[in-house]
UniProtKB/Swiss-Prot annotation:
Protein function: Substrate-recognition component of a Cul2-RING (CRL2) E3 ubiquitin-protein ligase complex of the DesCEND (destruction via C-end degrons) pathway, which recognizes a C-degron located at the extreme C terminus of target proteins, leading to their ubiquitination and degradation. The C-degron recognized by the DesCEND pathway is usually a motif of less than ten residues and can be present in full-length proteins, truncated proteins or proteolytically cleaved forms.
Expression tissues: Primarily detected in the embryonic central nervous system.
Protein name per the record: Protein fem-1 homolog B
Keyword Repeat: yes
Residue spans of the ANK repeats: 48-80, 90-122, 123-155, 156-188, 189-221, 222-244, 496-543
Cross-referenced InterPro entries: Ankyrin_rpt (IPR002110), Ankyrin_rpt-contain_sf (IPR036770)
Native organism: Drosophila melanogaster
A GO BP entry: proteasome-mediated ubiquitin-dependent protein catabolic process
Pathway: Protein modification; protein ubiquitination
Keywords linked to the UniProt accession: ANK repeat, Repeat, Ubl conjugation pathway
């Protein structure tokens, strides 16, 4: 009976697709209603959990929906989990799905059948919001006419007007406004619909909102829609604000024009130094437009990363830098920081771009100063810096490749310390993740940071080998050991359980190809030596219970120089106390798993010479499957587990 129930449910599920023929009926020997109204637990590999009605609404299968509504007692408001625009939406009803997919006829059928028109998803998204997102004016009008709440908000207090404004659906915005949508409502972040329209550059939407009484409110970062438009380089939108003198004071206009010009001077896509200077000049002229009421700049303290640049404060000073692009760049970075503030997440991007340009020009030191400052800003605001850290590793590898002697430990060690701090921060986020958090994203970032850390340690070992050529003293060495010990003490690992030592001896680990490929090749004896010296365990196991020795002899790079490196690492591991008879989850020792005969012979020789009575006893217990859990001192349990295929310990 259970198998028959499953098969019939499956047939009804599949019949919801367009062109399916099963909609006409079902097995008469079983009550069809059971298969139509069953809970939405038909889980799919992609994360969806759907009823036949929801699937039919998703696919626009009008005939199937009509059959269900007219012949069966279906639950119209059954909540399902659906994939919409690449994301899983939890608690979506058939009406929400039909509205979001743009199936007007099905929307009408469901509403007429009694579907709750304001039934929200788990994130408090209504069917009207889904229709506004897609810009389906016909569905929006129908839902409003049938009682949809135009001012309904989601969990972030973001209403339907905001999403329509962000997406640039001009006619939908006008319809919402005409039906009572409040133009000046604010989301939890303080943003209004005008912020979203200005950010996206939708001039027609901005004008519609202004015509319906929208004002320039500040969000939680103190940014108005005018500043939002300026920071995103939407000149036409900013001019629309300026053309309405009741919206902005003269000083507010000046500030917005300065931000527009400063952003043009340091934007990756729309960089235009002439436009930048033009807007800065226009702003300065406005400051002095009334000789009796000059609007002075509120100049901030200088920033070392910007060459301690002091902003120009009058027209002669601005004229003096017209032909000096570097001065315009530094002026603009200082202006952006003054206007946006250090807590604004948009501030670092221009700094990173300017640093990248300097690196391309071979001005590596200035690049490092800017990038270090950008990382500090992001870490201060709890923003992930995994890409920034990788970018630094790439830069250091480039410097070593281009001008070998201009990189020192004073440059690399602070970045390595920041990498360690970022990994620690990520580990805390993953451990304390709330139900609505995204731990998989943090785990991906952690994986990247672990690999970047290894790149940096590898670069440090390269520099340390040139000790005679550099001023590398005991203080540098102690700084290195201190940071590496923190990595090890915090048990830094990839998602699959590999420690830094595992990664350091992995000969087939993918290496970033942007300069680091040439510099950071593995396995690396020097890197492994530093890790072991700082306390990395040679018997630590990953999720497949492979020790670093297993990884060394199975993840093999067959080039001749790498094989010699592997032999040195093998000897290092033996001296550090590696257990040669430790088995992985497949029951293999390093010797039995080894892919290179020359290394296998070495392993067998060492195994014969170094196997202890303690190891033999552990292997005997494992071979005979004797129960030892709780019967011996706890420190011995892990030792026996190392020699056993069965996983006994948690």
């Amino acid at each position: 009976m259970h198998a028959e129930l499953y098969r019939t449910r499956k047939r009804w599920y599949e019949s919801a697709w367009p062109g399916a023929g099963f909609w006409r009926g079902a097995n008469d020997t079983l009550p069809v209603t059971n298969y139509i109204t069953y809970p939405a637990n038909f889980d799919q590999p992609d994360g969806q959990s759907l009823t036949p009605l929801t699937m039919a609404a998703m696919m626009g299968n009008v005939k199937f929906v009509k059959t269900l509504l007219s012949h069966y007692d279906v639950d119209l408001d059954r909540e399902c989990n659906v994939i919409y625009d690449g994301m899983v939406v939890y608690g979506a009803t058939a009406l929400w799905v039909a509205a979001g997919m743009g199936h007007l006829q099905i929307v009408k059928m469901l509403v007429q059948a009694g579907a709750a028109i304001n039934h929200n998803t788990k994130a408090q998204s209504s069917p009207l919001r889904a229709a506004c997102y897609e810009g389906r004016l016909d569905i929006v009008e129908f839902l409003i006419d049938n009682g949809a709440d135009v001012n309904a908000t989601n969990l972030f207090n973001n209403n339907t007007l905001m999403i329509a404004a962000y997406k640039g659906h001009h006619l939908v915005v006008k319809t919402l406004l005409q039906n009572g949508s409040r133009a000046n409502d604010q989301a939890l972040c303080g943003a209004t619909a005008l912020h979203y329209a200005a950010e996206s550059g939708h001039l027609d939407v901005v004008v519609a909102l202004l015509d319906h009484g929208a004002t320039l409110k500040k969000n939680e970062l103190g940014i108005t829609p005018a500043l939002q438009a300026a920071e995103r380089l939407h000149e036409d939108v900013l001019e629309a604000f300026i053309e309405r003198p009741e919206l902005m004071s003269l000083e507010e206009q000046i500030t917005a024009l300065e931000l527009l010009g400063a952003t043009y001077a340091n934007d990756k896509i729309k960089y235009d130094v002439n436009k930048a200077y033009g807007y800065l000049l226009r702003a300065m002229q406005l400051r002095y437009s009334n000789p009796r009421g000059v609007i002075r700049k509120r100049v901030q303290p200088t920033v070392p990363a910007y060459d301690n640049w002091l902003e120009t404060e009058n027209l002669p000073e601005l004229y003096a830098i017209k032909l000096n692009h570097h001065s315009i760049h530094m002026e603009s970075l200082a202006i952006r920081e003054r206007i946006l503030g250090r807590n604004n997440p948009e501030l670092p991007q221009a700094i990173i771009y300017r640093g990248a340009v300097m690196a391309d020009q071979g001005r590596f030191y200035q690049c490092q100063v800017l990038w270090n400052y950008a990382i500090d800003l992001r870490m201060r605001n709890n923003v992930s810096v995994d890409r920034d850290l990788l970018r630094f590793a790439q830069l250091f590898a480039q410097i070593l490749r281009v001008e070998n002697h201009n990189l020192t430990l004073d440059h690399v060690l602070p970045v390595l310390a920041k990498c360690q701090q970022e990994i620690e921060n990520n580990k805390f986020k993953i451990k304390e993740a709330k139900p609505n958090a995204c731990p998989s994203l943090w785990q991906d970032q952690n994986n990247q940071n672990c690999i970047t850390a290894l790149y940096l340690i590898k670069i440090v070992t390269h520099l340390a080998r040139r000790k005679k050529d550099q001023n590398i003293d005991e203080e540098h060495i102690q700084q290195l050991f201190l940071v590496v010990r923190k990595f090890i003490q915090n048990d830094t690992r990839l998602q699959d359980g590999q420690t830094l030592l595992h990664i350091a001896v992995n000969g087939v680990m993918p290496v970033d190809e942007f300069y680091t490929n040439e510099m950071c090749r593995f396995p690396c004896y020097a890197t492994a030596l530093v890790l072991v010296h700082c306390g990395a365990s040679v018997v630590a196991v990953d999720s497949d219970r492979n020790t670093p020795l297993h990884i060394l002899v199975t993840k093999v790079n067959t080039t001749q120089d790498r094989q010699a490196e592997m032999a040195r690492i093998l000897e290092l591991f033996v001296e550090a106390g590696a257990h040669l008879d430790a088995v992985n989850a497949a029951g293999q020792t390093a010797a039995t798993a080894c892919k290179l005969p020359i290394l296998a012979n070495r392993l067998h020789a060492h195994q014969n010479a170094h196997t202890s009575l303690k190891c033999l006893a552990a292997r005997s217990i494992a071979t005979n499957r004797l129960n030892f859990k709780g019967l011996i001192p706890t420190q011995l349990e892990a030792f026996i587990q190392m020699h056993s295929v069965r996983k006994v310990l948690p």
